């Protein structure tokens, strides 16, 4: 629909929009910000792929699935919040090499091959669940792309023992 349009710098989708087509905003090189409404529940294949300037993505609804290569080579993307996600498909964030941190909900069940391939700067994964949930996720999925990232587990209160835990401070993830 809008692929290759370099005049788009920001997209704010109203709640009445319930779906996006594959490749809808593919190669929109000047796009820096996307905000989805509550009507969007999944993102299709290559929907924002190769949007080289995309820095800020806000999901106001419950995004359950991110499709194949949805954010492929979005090289300016640095942080991401996926609190309600259940499926991240093949190569969804491959080549997002400026991605530094993500917040992932404990609803995550499936991470397919190369979901975070070539995200070499991904330092921190802030997981909203506990260690046992993460290890189960790890056993059932290929999370090798996250091998060099520190995984933090959510704890509202400061733990009395060591480990990688985090909490929200002023709306942002903060390690304990």
What is each of the regions a protein language model found here?
Residues 155, 168-169:
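Acidic surface patches and DE-rich sequence motifs
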Residues 72, 94, 116-117, 137-142:
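A structural signal for leucine-rich repeat
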Residues 167, 173-175:
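Short linear proline/tyrosine/threonine-rich motifs used for host-factor recruitment
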Residues 1-3, 21-26, 44-47, 67-70, ...:
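Consensus positions within tandem repeat domains that build extended binding/scaffold surfaces
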Residues 137-138, 163-167:
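Short conserved micro-motifs at the rims of enzyme active sites and ligand-binding pockets
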Residues 142-143, 171:
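Noncatalytic linker/hinge segments flanking ATPase motor cores
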